From Swiss-Prot:
One of its GO terms (molecular function) is peptidase activity. GO terms for cellular component: plasma membrane. The chain crosses the membrane at residues 52-74, 87-107, 111-131, 151-168, 173-190. The keyword Transmembrane applies. It comes from Listeria monocytogenes serotype 4b (strain F2365). This is Putative AgrB-like protein.
């Protein structure tokens, strides 16, 4: 029994503690949905705490926030790949939002570099956004067109922010976070990771 328990993910064990199965004894499907949702929340909270805890301890909090917000700003409408395993997701998050800010924090960029980089990013948004996954197919051509348009507008807004911000090192961190999102929507990344691209085609 102890061996089995040890193999159960921490998030699942915490979800079992937080919700009472007895209250859902007449609705097994409802219980599983609530439990799954709670597990996702717990996983994200723990991952967030780990990433930002390390960033805080290492003095990288501002750098981590800059890279992360730039990434999330573009990801909101362009979507892209997700890691299929929690451990992989956590390790990738640490590399993207702790290691990368550490490496690039003291590298300055000028506005010509910003314009060139965001020109490349905008082109990728035009060509590849939004990119879906097997678990989240983006169904509906008009829906995808709307997301693409919003992703491109978001890119232009972020370009303006990067151009206007007076700190050369901050410009670099904004570009790093944005390029991470470009990688997540590029079909070459899907191919290298052997993930299915254009998953919506299966449903249309």
């Amino acid at each position: 029994m102890s061996n089995f328990t040890a193999k159960v993910p921490l998030s699942e064990r915490m979800a079992d503690v937080l919700i009472s199965k007895d209250r859902w004894k007449d609705d097994e499907e409802g219980y599983l949905k609530v439990k799954y949702g709670l597990e996702i929340i717990l996983i994200n909270v723990m991952k967030f705490a780990l990433v930002y805890g390390i960033a805080l301890v290492t003095g990288l909090l501002l750098q981590t926030v800059t890279v992360h917000l730039s990434y999330l700003w573009l990801r909101r409408y362009s979507f892209g790949l997700h890691a299929t395993k929690t451990l992989n997701c956590t390790l990738i998050s640490l590399m993207m939002f702790v290691l990368a800010p550490f490496v690039f924090q003291n590298i300055p960029s000028n506005n010509w570099i910003v314009l060139g980089t965001f020109g490349f990013i905008l082109l990728n948004m035009f060509l590849f956004a939004p990119a879906d996954t097997e678990s989240l197919p983006l169904i509906g051509e008009e829906h995808r067109k709307t997301l693409k348009r919003k992703a491109m507008i978001g890119t232009l807004i972020l370009t303006g922010i990067a151009l206007l911000i007076p700190f050369a090192e901050m410009k670099t961190l904004i570009m790093v976070g944005s390029l991470f999102q470009v990688i997540s929507i590029n079909p070459l990344t899907y191919k290298l990771l052997k993930r299915r691209y254009r998953n919506y085609e299966k449903y249309e």
